């Protein structure tokens, strides 16, 4: 019974993903974007408005409406430009972006990772990890880490910022709207607390 239920759920989930547009198990992109949201100069299969469910290689920069699987890039993955929902691993020397990462997104880049809306997973880079508007559940590690809404997990960097925090922030400057967890840093801010700033170690519950 459990096996039958699992199969039914898997089929329904796959049908939901594939119903959002055409898809391919393999994708490839050649070229760079001239400007954000401008696909001139990019030769890509499948097209940006379609999806890849499996493996995509970008010999420059790539973007798809949905990208589920492994996405290595020679330059960057820019799925947010196609409002793409990403599930899986993005790896690029420059940057990775995604429209959403609710399926579970893992971003590893040299400089910058961004999810425009809510996400689960981890972001690892040198300079800035950002979840712009929604929640983030997972790990962020870079010089700067930012979550626009609720955060559950761990942020490690010089500057960490989020909405309601459940978890841990480790850095020089930590900033949260509310705290149910731990902040370790030179300055720790909780804007909805009577004592907004507290040094070194701060515990909230």
Language model segments and positions:
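Surface-exposed, glycine- and small/polar-enriched segments that build interaction surfaces at terminal
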Residues: 20-205
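Positively charged n-region of N-terminal signal peptides that target proteins for export
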Residues: 1-4
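Hydrophobic h-region of N-terminal signal peptides that target proteins for export
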Residues: 10-18
